[in-house]
Amino acid sequence: MAKVYTDKDADLSVFKGKTLAVLGFGSQGHAHALNLKESGANVIIGLYEGSKSIAVAREKGFEVVPTAEAVKRADVIFVALPDTKQPACYEKDIAPNLTKGKTLLFSHGFAIHYKTIVPPKDVDVILVAPKGPGHIVRRQFTEGKGVPALIAIYQNASKKAKKTALAWAKGVGGTRAGVIETTFKEETETDLFGEQTVLCGGASALVQAGFETLVEAGYSPEMAYFECLHELKLIVDLMNEAGIAGMRFSISETAKWGDVSVGPKIVDASVKKRMKAALKDIQSGKFAKEWVAEYKGGYKKYNALLKKGEQHPIEKTGAKLRSLMPWMQKRSIKGAQAAY
């Protein structure tokens, strides 16, 4: 059983007299920066010239400087950039200013695990990964709560890397909910697997297939949307609060019987076999190589597949039904982006 670290295990005084730099001000970047600032840390923001986030960060009270200067001035540098942007930023702005004794921090292990970034041996390399999107990390913090987080140590040149990771986790609210130590390898591979087979890829494909099945059988798109997408959140919320068994306690006997007798016929051994194949591609680095080649090649297949998804009939039906529920609007894509 993994040890769970809480507030009493972390010490924010680790950051006394130090400067923390957050490179980027997107989903995780804005949340970490604001939470750390309100926890008493000295935080600066590093952004490239012309970034639209400069005005937003300054409005929030931060000193904003060019990325290279932020790295030069900081003791701890959080690379809060997309996986695809990190290598170029590292080569141009981070590496030339990454001197002995500094700490490089990530919220996802992709770049380090797959070696798209290879830091020098005389710096600490750590991971602090809240298990939730940035706007939730921020909201929970402002409400006096927190989002569970993972920490990992890749390089410990100072022999104090774990203290730094725990202090950062406390500063963003993670130790309020509980922090577990892992490795860059485990975080990266399990995160990718979850995204691809269950949380994003698996759930999206399952919802679309269910919607298509009902519509092709002559049922209205509206009914198909409610049954296969809208109600999914209600069930997942129950699972999140009380586990699968707890969710089953809250649904009807008929629903329970359909769950346990039909569910395994849909997600059967063949699905698990393909899940294992997806995991193998992650473990071997095949997925990473394909993704790096895709973004270096201009995102052609990526953009085509996203466009295809946007044109699925469930999107038009969903937009129409959600427009009838005004309380849903603040959860729209634009609403979420405005939070940054």
Question: Predicted segment positions?
Answer:
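A short, basic/flexible loop-to-alpha-helix module at the beginning of a structural domain
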Residues: 1-17
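Glycine-rich adenosine-cofactor-binding loop
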Residues: 19-32
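NAD(P)-binding Rossmann-fold cofactor-contacting core
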Residues: 31, 37-60
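Rossmann-fold NAD(P) dinucleotide-binding segment
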Residues: 68-117
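Rossmann-fold dinucleotide-binding core
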Residues: 105-196
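Active-site-proximal catalytic alpha-helix in oxidoreductases
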Residues: 159-163, 170-173, 178-217, 222-240
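Interdomain hinge/lid region at the active-site interface
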Residues: 209-212, 216-217, 242-303
